[in-house]
Design a protein with these regions (language model features):
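Active-site neighborhood of phospho(di)ester-bond hydrolases with catalytic His/Asp-centered motifs
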Residues: 2-5, 35-38, 67-69, 95, ...
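Histidine-centered catalytic micro-motifs
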Residues: 2-11, 126-130
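Divalent metal-dependent hydrolysis catalytic cores, especially in the metallo-beta-lactamase
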Residues: 5-8, 14, 21-44, 63-71, ...
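Acidic-and-aromatic substrate-binding clefts and catalytic sites of carbohydrate-active enzymes
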Residues: 11-18, 40-48, 71-78, 101-106, ...
C-alpha cells in the first residue's frame, strides 16, 4: 500500500495538469491513494478547483483525499469559502502556503480564521515549508504549540534542522517527504521520527524542474529511493495517511 500525501492538479507555471493526467501517472507508478490540492487555487479559480477534485474523485473514489487550499482572498470575500464548503466535496485537509500568500505571516487574525476552518472540518493543516524565511519550519512552532489540539503537517520539512526541532517539540505534527532530499529523510530516521513521516512526491510539479522525465517515472524513482533509505520501515511509512481519519 502506497499513499502519496502530496499531489497537485490544475494550473501551474508550466501549464495545465488535468485530473486524468494525475490519476493515470499515480496509478502507473503503483500508488494506491493520494492527497490532492489544486494549484488552480493560486489563480482563485474556485469553480475549476471543485471541478478538478470532483473529477479525481470520480476516478478514484475514497482513494482520493481532497485538500482545500485556502488563500487570504477566500476568507476576505463573502462567497468563495461558502462555495467551497458547500461543494459536496468532503475536504480532508487544509493547506496554507506562506510563500505564495505572505499575508498569512502578517495577519494573525486571518491565520486564526483559516485554522478555525480546519477546526470546523476537523482536518489536519498542511503548511508549506521552504527556503524563504517566511516559510521556514521554525516560524510555525509557536502557531503549532498555540493550537495543540489540531494536527499539522510540515510539507517538505525545510530547513530540515528546524523541522526536526518542531517535530521533537510538538507531538501534534507530521512531516511529508515531497521534494525532500534523501539526506534529509535519513536525518529524520536517525532522530527516531519514522512514525511522523508521510510519504509525498509533489507530483506533477516535477515537470517544472525535470521536463524530460515522465511523472509516473519520477514518482516510481522517488518510491525506489525512499525504499533504499527506509529499508524495513518503508511499508509503514508508505501506507500512512492521516487525511480522512
Amino acid at each position: 500500500m502506497i499513499i502519496d500525501n502530496h499531489v497537485h492538479v490544475g494550473w501551474f507555471t508550466d501549464g495545465y495538469h488535468s485530473p486524468k493526467e494525475i490519476w493515470v501517472s499515480e496509478m502507473a507508478a503503483g500508488v494506491d491513494g493520494m492527497a490532492v490540492a489544486s494549484t488552480s487555487t493560486c489563480a482563485e479559480l474556485y469553480k475549476d478547483v471543485c471541478r478538478e477534485l470532483r473529477e479525481l474523485i470520480r476516478f478514484g473514489g475514497e482513494k482520493v483525499h481532497p485538500i482545500l487550499w485556502l488563500t487570504p482572498r477566500m476568507l476576505k470575500l463573502n462567497y468563495p469559502l461558502p462555495y467551497m464548503l458547500h461543494s459536496k466535496i468532503k475536504w480532508q485537509g487544509i493547506k496554507l502556503h506562506f510563500e505564495s500568500h505572505p499575508e498569512w505571516s502578517k495577519n494573525r487574525a486571518l491565520l486564526n480564521k483559516a485554522l478555525d476552518v480546519a477546526k470546523l472540518l476537523d482536518v489536519p493543516v498542511l503548511l508549506h515549508t521552504g527556503n524563504f524565511e517566511v516559510s521556514h519550519a521554525g516560524r510555525f512552532k509557536d502557531v503549532i504549540q498555540d493550537h495543540s489540539e489540531q494536527t499539522f503537517i510540515l510539507a517538505h520539512g525545510r530547513p530540515i534542522e528546524e523541522a526536526i526541532d518542531v517535530l521533537l517539540s510538538c507531538s501534534n505534527t507530521y512531516v511529508d517527504t515531497a521534494f525532500m532530499p534523501m539526506s534529509d529523510l535519513q536525518k529524520l530516521v536517525e532522530e527516531g521520527l519514522t512514525d511522523r513521516i508521510l510519504f509525498g512526491t509533489d507530483a506533477p510539479i516535477n515537470k517544472v524542474f525535470f521536463k524530460e522525465i515522465d511523472t509516473s517515472m519520477y514518482i516510481q524513482d522517488t518510491i525506489n529511493q525512499t525504499y533504499k533509505i527506509l529499508g524495513d520501515k518503508a511499508d509503514g511509512i508508505f501506507s500512512r495517511c492521516i487525511y480522512g481519519e
